[in-house]
């Protein structure tokens, strides 16, 4: 999995760049879905980064809670609040200290590509926090989500990287399920209920479907209607990084599936779309 999170701020100028999406429905992405993935999937994983890596919390030296709102015209809106070395994301920008507006989903996606430099419409006085804390934090996240081979030789780094990748992919599944045309079609075939994505003896996430709308809960599911269980964290990481195939893992028993086949089948279809967005 490759995810870009190179964010730059410049108080004197702003530059933007965009790429035109082209191709067929099943092999290309749309900018609106990508914006939802980038905000809730990628930047939303900052919550988990701060919880897993002490170096992340050390970057957050603000003594009072400080919140950054991201408002995308025709797209998502969310606020990340930083407090006591941790952070929390919530939908909406009604209560934020710093607001970063984007005129389109394409412009917001450029933020994470490093090709768009945003200018705050509110809270310009907090530019120091953006430069000294937020940007280094996103750089650290990018290091884990786009790891160098040498870094992955460190077992501790590899474990954190895999966990963050799992959380990012799990949230991306819901965004694709709700916004991507092909994903919406697959979600329309999934009955109400919880789908568990678990790692044996380790972490787990829940995909909750209600009225053909999906949300991701970053916690294990006690009573799922369907479940996908990885034998260990390493297998989960290999699958999400595209190093092994799901079918091969199912055949050798490193991934177990149970419950309603229809739910698992359609989630796998959505996961295929996720891999294209995060490639």
What residue ranges belong to the model's regions?
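Feature captures hydrophobic
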Residues: 4-9, 15-279
């Amino acid at each position: 999995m490759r995810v870009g999170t190179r964010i730059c701020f410049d108080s004197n100028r702003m530059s933007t760049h965009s790429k035109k999406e082209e191709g067929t429905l099943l092999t290309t992405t749309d900018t609106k879905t990508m914006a939802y993935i980038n905000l809730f999937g990628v930047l939303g994983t900052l919550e988990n980064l701060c919880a897993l890596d002490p170096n992340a919390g050390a970057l957050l030296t603000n003594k009072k809670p400080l919140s950054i709102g991201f408002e995308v015209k025709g797209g998502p809106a969310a606020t990340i609040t930083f407090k006591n070395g941790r952070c929390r994301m919530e939908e909406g920008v009604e209560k934020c200290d710093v607001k970063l507006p984007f005129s389109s989903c394409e412009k917001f996606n450029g933020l994470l590509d490093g090709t768009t430099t945003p200018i705050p419409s509110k809270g310009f006085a907090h530019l120091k926090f953006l430069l000294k804390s937020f940007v280094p934090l996103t750089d650290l996240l990018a290091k884990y989500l786009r790891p160098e081979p040498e870094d992955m030789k460190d077992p501790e780094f590899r474990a954190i990287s895999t966990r963050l990748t799992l959380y990012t992919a799990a949230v991306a599944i819901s965004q694709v399920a709700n916004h991507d045309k092909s994903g919406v079609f697959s979600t329309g075939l999934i009955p109400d209920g919880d789908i568990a994505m678990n790692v044996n003896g380790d972490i787990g996430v829940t995909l909750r479907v209600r009225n053909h709308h999906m949300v991701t809960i970053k916690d294990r599911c006690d009573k799922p209607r369907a479940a996908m269980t990885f034998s260990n964290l390493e297998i989960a990481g290999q699958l999400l990084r595209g190093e092994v195939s799901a079918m091969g893992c199912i055949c050798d028993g490193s991934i177990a599936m149970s419950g309603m086949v229809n739910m698992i089948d359609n989630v796998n279809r959505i996961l295929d779309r996720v891999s294209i967005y995060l490639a």
